[in-house]
C-alpha cells in the first residue's frame, strides 16, 4: 500500500512540467486561411440548408428597390448593434444568460388609437387597388385604427403597447414574439414560408418600410403550434423611441412586385394568399361561412392563445454589478488579443471575396466580408509549482493525443446579412456567427 502511494507521489513530481505552448496542433497562416475559407463555404450552405451552391443564372441588371431597402435596413441594424456594444465595451451577455431574469408577458391589444392615414400610392398604370399599393399604404408607417383581427389575405399586422416597460429599457436582455399557428384544414397549399418584419416609420416612399427579422416554414394543415421569433432589437428600439413602435408584419416569402429596369415599371404579381391561420389575429370570418363546426373548433383552440411578447429583464441591481464586472474583463483581454504583431492567440484578419475565394456568383450583396479567424499560441497562465499544473501534466502523459493546454478559439461572433438569388428570385437571409470579432484561449 505504501509502495503504491509513493509511486503515485513520485509520478506526479517527476513528470515534466506542462509545456508553455498549447498542445493544439499548429498550422502556418496559409493553412489556417485555407481551412477557414473551406469552413465558411460549408457554414453558409449549411445555414441556408443547401447541399450545393445554386445553379448559376444571369445576374439581374438591377435589383428591385424594395429588396435593396430591406437588405440595407437589416444590415444597418446589425452594424448599429455592433457599434453600441463596442461603445459600451460589451460582449455577448453570457453572464446575464446564466443568472435568473424577470419575465414579463405583454398581450396583443385589441385596438390602437387612430393615426394619420397614408398618402395614396399609385403604380405606373395608375392603379391604386393592387396588392403593392395596399401593402405600401399599410407599411408606410402611418397605420389606420383597425383591429388586428381585420382580415388581410396577404399579410397580418400585429402591434403591442410596451410603454409600461420603458423605464426598464436598459435592463432588457431578450424579447420573444410568440404567436400560435392554428390548423387550417381548408388550406390550398400544405406548406408555406412565412416571414416576420418590423414595420418602419418612413418619411417618404423611397425609404424602407419594413425590416426583415426572421422566417419559418410552416405546415398549414398540420396541428397547431407555437411559433417564436427573437425580436429583442425591435423591442429595444421601441422602448427607447416610442414613436417607432408600429408593430410587426407577418407575410409570405414572395415579392409583391416585379421591377422592370428598361422602363422603370412596377408590375404587381399575383401573390399567393397567406394560408396559415393565427390565434387571436384571424377571426372566424377567415373560414368558410356556414361551417359552424370549424368555427366552433377554431374558437376553442384559440382560447388563451393570444399573440404576446415575452420580455426578459435583469433586475437593476444585478445589471449594475455585472456591467462593471464585464468591463473589467474586456480591459484585461484587449491588451492581450489585439496587438498588431503577436505570436500568441489573437484575432487575424481575413477578407472573403465570394467570387474570388469561393467561386460563387449567386450572392449579390455583400461582395465579400471580413470573416477573420483566431490563431496563435496559448501559454499557461498558472505557475509550475501548482497542483493544477501537475494534474494536467499527468493527464497529458496518459492521453498524449489530447490537448491538455488551451487552444485559440473564437469568443465574440456577429451575424452577416446576405442578399442572394435562387434562380431569378431574390432572398435575404441573416446568417448567425459568421464574423469573428475576438478570440480567447480555451
Swiss-Prot record:
Listed GO CC annotations: axon; basement membrane; cell surface; endosome; extracellular matrix; extracellular region; extracellular space; neuronal cell body
SS bond partners: 337-346, 345-408, 374-439, 378-441
Keywords: Cleavage on pair of basic residues, Disulfide bond, Extracellular matrix, Glycoprotein, Growth factor, Mitogen, Secreted, Signal
One Pfam match: TGF_beta
Tissue expr: Expressed in cardiomyocytes.
Entry-listed glycosylation sites: 72, 168, 269
Gene Ontology molecular function, alphabetical: amyloid-beta binding; cytokine activity; growth factor activity; identical protein binding; protein homodimerization activity; protein-containing complex binding; signaling receptor binding; transforming growth factor beta receptor binding
Protein's GO biological process: activation-induced cell death of T cells; ascending aorta morphogenesis; atrial septum morphogenesis; atrial septum primum morphogenesis; atrioventricular valve morphogenesis; axon guidance; blood vessel development; blood vessel remodeling
Protein family according to the UniProt entry: Belongs to the TGF-beta family.
Full protein name: Transforming growth factor beta-2 proprotein
Organism encoding this protein: Rattus norvegicus
Amino acid at each position: 500500500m505504501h509502495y503504491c502511494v509513493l509511486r503515485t507521489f513520485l509520478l506526479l513530481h517527476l513528470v515534466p512540467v506542462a509545456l508553455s505552448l498549447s498542445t493544439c496542433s499548429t498550422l502556418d497562416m496559409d493553412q489556417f486561411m485555407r481551412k477557414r475559407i473551406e469552413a465558411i463555404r460549408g457554414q453558409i450552405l449549411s445555414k441556408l440548408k443547401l447541399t450545393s451552391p445554386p445553379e448559376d443564372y444571369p445576374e439581374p441588371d438591377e435589383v428591385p428597390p424594395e429588396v435593396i431597402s430591406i437588405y440595407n435596413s437589416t444590415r444597418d441594424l446589425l452594424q448599429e448593434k455592433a457599434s453600441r456594444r463596442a461603445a459600451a465595451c460589451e460582449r455577448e451577455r453570457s453572464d446575464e444568460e446564466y443568472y435568473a431574469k424577470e419575465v414579463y408577458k405583454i398581450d396583443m391589444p385589441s385596438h390602437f388609437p387612430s393615426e394619420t392615414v397614408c398618402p395614396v400610392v399609385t403604380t405606373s398604370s395608375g392603379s391604386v387597388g393592387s396588392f403593392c399599393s395596399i401593402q405600401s399604404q399599410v407599411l408606410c408607417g402611418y397605420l389606420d385604427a383597425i383591429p388586428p383581427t381585420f382580415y388581410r389575405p396577404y399579410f397580418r399586422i400585429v402591434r403591442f403597447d410596451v410603454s409600461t416597460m420603458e423605464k426598464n429599457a436598459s435592463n432588457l436582455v431578450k424579447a420573444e414574439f410568440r404567436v400560435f399557428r392554428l390548423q387550417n384544414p381548408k388550406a390550398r397549399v400544405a406548406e408555406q414560408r412565412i416571414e416576420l418584419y418590423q414595420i418602419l416609420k418612413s418619411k417618404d416612399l423611397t425609404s424602407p418600410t419594413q425590416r426583415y427579422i426572421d422566417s419559418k416554414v410552416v405546415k398549414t394543415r398540420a396541428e397547431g403550434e407555437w411559433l417564436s421569433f427573437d425580436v429583442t432589437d425591435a423591442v429595444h428600439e421601441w422602448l427607447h423611441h416610442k414613436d417607432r413602435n408600429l408593430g410587426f408584419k407577418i407575410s409570405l416569402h414572395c415579392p409583391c412586385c416585379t421591377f422592370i429596369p428598361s422602363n422603370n415599371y412596377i408590375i404587381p404579381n399575383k401573390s399567393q394568399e397567406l394560408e396559415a391561420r393565427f390565434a387571436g389575429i384571424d377571426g372566424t370570418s377567415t373560414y368558410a361561412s356556414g361551417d359552424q363546426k370549424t368555427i366552433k373548433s377554431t374558437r376553442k383552440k384559440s382560447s388563451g392563445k393570444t399573440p404576446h411578447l415575452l420580455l426578459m429583464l435583469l433586475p437593476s441591481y444585478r445589471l449594475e454589478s455585472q456591467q462593471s464586472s464585464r468591463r473589467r474583463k474586456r480591459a484585461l483581454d484587449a491588451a492581450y488579443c489585439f496587438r498588431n504583431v503577436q505570436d500568441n492567440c489573437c484575432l487575424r484578419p481575413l477578407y472573403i471575396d465570394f467570387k474570388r475565394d469561393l467561386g460563387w456568383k449567386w450572392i449579390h450583396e455583400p461582395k465579400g466580408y471580413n470573416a477573420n479567424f483566431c490563431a496563435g499560441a496559448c501559454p499557461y497562465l498558472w505557475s509550475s509549482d501548482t497542483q493544477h499544473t501537475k494534474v494536467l501534466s499527468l493527464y497529458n502523459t496518459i492521453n498524449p493525443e489530447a490537448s491538455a493546454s488551451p487552444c485559440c478559439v473564437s469568443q465574440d461572433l456577429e451575424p452577416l446579412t446576405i442578399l442572394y438569388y435562387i434562380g431569378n428570385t431574390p432572398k435575404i437571409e441573416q446568417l448567425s456567427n459568421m464574423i469573428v470579432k475576438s478570440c480567447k484561449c480555451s
